[in-house]
Each structure stands twice: as C-alpha cells, then as structure tokens.
Design a protein with these regions (language model features):
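Cross-family detector of peptidyl-prolyl cis-trans isomerase
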Residues: 1-165
Length: 165
C-alpha cells in the first residue's frame, strides 16, 4: 500500500476512534461501566444506586473527577444549592460509609457548606449527571477524620445531581 494511502487510513481510524470515545463519554448510554485507569469502577443505571468497585493500589494524591453519566440540565455553580443522591466509600478498605440511596431520600445543601473536594469537584456537573469524585484527605476530612472516616482517608463519592438552584 502506498505511504500516502496508509497515512490516510490511519487518519480515518483515528477520527473514528475519537468520535466513538466522544459519543460514549457524552452520555450515549445510561448504563455505564468502567473507569479511567486507577479509579474505581462505577456501574448502574441513572436513577438507581450505583455499584462501586474500588481499585487496588495507592490512592491518587490529587482530586480526581469523572463524569459517569453526563447530565443535560442546570449546571452546578460554586454558589449553588444542590439536591443529590450520593454514595461514600473509603479508599483504604472499600468500606461503604454512607449512602443517601439507603434511606431513599436525597440530600439538599449549599455547595459552599461541604468539604473542599465537593466544592472543587462538583461545579460543572449538570442535573441528570452522575459524577465520581476521588477526594484526597486534604480536601476531605484531613488528619483528624470524622466519625467512621479515619485520619488521612481518601474518599470515594459517586454523586447523582437531581436538582440545582
């Protein structure tokens, strides 16, 4: 095959790969599985409690976010009040700490009143979306921990954005 033709074939394949990746990351399917390397795997349908499979290995040192389902509604701003469903696990042992899904009622609060990891990780998310947050201790509960969360614990949250005001 001539060199120019081969280059064109690779260019077309690259464009198709990017288009496919863009479609699937922009909410092409409400049942989402998989994650970026090193992050927890999150599965489940929109409107239902997620299933989280924590990864093994060292926790990331910086805040990590990943849209599992991309919402199409109102965007979260730093000044927003949110209504969300969430699930919280600890990185160190994969223990479920808390889930609003268990009580059946979502939580409502001003974004300015929660941990730094949420304040920095949720703006830009939209109603109808599901976002994974992996929050290092310095943006969570720090060296003291809080209740069942131990000192210097990395937190895994999956947050479904229900309403923004």
């Amino acid at each position: 095959m001539p060199k120019k033709t081969l280059v064109k074939v690779f260019a077309v394949l690259a464009v198709l790969a990017i288009a496919f990746a863009s479609f699937t990351s922009l909410g092409g399917d409400d049942t989402v599985s998989g994650s970026r390397a090193g992050l927890p795997a999150v599965t489940g349908n929109a409107g239902e409690a997620p299933t989280i499979t924590p990864p093994t290995g060292a926790a990331p040192a910086t805040l990590q976010t990943q849209d599992i389902i991309v919402g199409t509604g109102t965007e979260v701003l730093p000044t927003s009040t949110l209504t969300v469903h969430y699930t919280l696990m600890t990185w160190s042992n994969g223990a479920l700490v808390e889930s609003s899904w268990n009580g059946g009622q979502p939580a409502t609060f001003p974004l300015s009143g929660v941990i730094a990891g949420w304040q920095e990780g949720l703006p830009g998310a939209k109603v109808g979306g599901r976002r994974l947050l992996v929050i290092p201790a310095d943006k969570g509960y720090g060296p003291n921990g809080s209740g069942p969360i131990g000192p210097n614990e990395t937190l895994i949250f999956v947050v479904d954005i229900i309403a923004v005001s």
